[in-house]
Regions:
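N-terminal accessory targeting/assembly segments
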Residues: 1-218, 222-230
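Glycine-rich phosphate-binding P-loop
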Residues: 250-255
Length: 255
């Protein structure tokens, strides 16, 4: 996980607001002055890279929430498979909320964009959301289109993003108390069951496992969703294997 660079002064949210007021209506390059770290209630906001103009690739922004503030139980991220599953879910949660605010701040080019890495059906380790196993600190990276009118700074619209939209996304998706604890537990349990299967297969002389009842056909060639009314998979009896999973219990399929 990226650590705060030495020599960079931590500023307050009030200082950021004051800075935005000073550069409002100036030429777009003045946005470069916002690069730095700012302490908000419950997290640190870092403006890591500022785009050159409103039509360029969006600015890189990240938030760091301390493990103590985030409040996630250690058993949800103590091992690698648990941590990847939790990181994936938090990124999805943040992304869904960010979509509601995308382009609500107006302007030219990519003004008002708020986005994170898009997740497919796969649960993968991504640099977009990282949890530090020693202390539970959460780092989440996003892209934001800094608003402009033409190529003139529209700081009031960026204020909406940084002081209204982003804080709401952070508190709703990165604080354990605001999330469905049972859902998080089910997600981590599923990850542990999957990891158990992966470790058991070599012991059984197998390289793959498909559970009975799986719907393998996809909705279309460009979709990862299962086909509606698709025929559920059923293993031939001679290739059937039963595993005892830590959480789900017995599961049968083709090995």
């Amino acid at each position: 996980m990226r650590k705060r660079k030495s020599g960079i002064k931590m500023q307050s949210e009030a200082e950021l607001r004051s800075l935005l007021s000073r550069i409002d209506h100036r030429g777009y390059p003045a946005y470069k002055d916002t690069k730095g770290q700012y302490r908000f209630p419950g997290y640190v906001l870092s403006i890591d890279h500022v785009q050159g103009d409103p039509f360029a690739s969006p600015s890189k922004v990240s938030v760091l929430v301390s493990g103590k503030t985030a409040g996630f139980p250690q058993e949800l991220y103590c091992g690698k498979c648990q941590r990847i599953a939790l990181q994936d879910e938090l990124l999805r949660q943040f992304g869904r909320r960010a979509e509601r605010f995308a382009f609500k701040a107006k302007g030219s080019g990519k003004s008002g964009l708020i986005s994170v890495s898009r997740c497919g059906q796969e649960v993968l380790e991504r640099t977009a959301c990282q949890i530090q196993p020693e202390n539970g600190n959460i780092l989440l990276r996003m892209e934001i289109g800094f608003p402009a009118n033409g190529r003139t700074i529209n700081a009031r619209e960026l204020e909406k993003i940084l002081f209204d939209f982003v804080p709401e996304c952070v508190k709703a998706s990165l604080f354990y108390k605001n999330l469905d604890a049972k859902r998080l537990r089910r997600i981590v349990d599923l990850a542990e069951d999957q990891e158990y299967i992966r470790k058991e297969l070599p012991k059984l002389g197998l390289c793959a496992f498909v559970a009975n009842g799986s719907v393998l056909p996809r909705e279309s060639g460009i979709s990862s969703r299962p086909m509606r009314d698709g025929i559920a998979f059923q293993s031939p009896k001679e290739q059937e294997v039963t595993l005892e999973l830590p959480h789900k219990g017995k599961i049968t399929g083709m090995g």
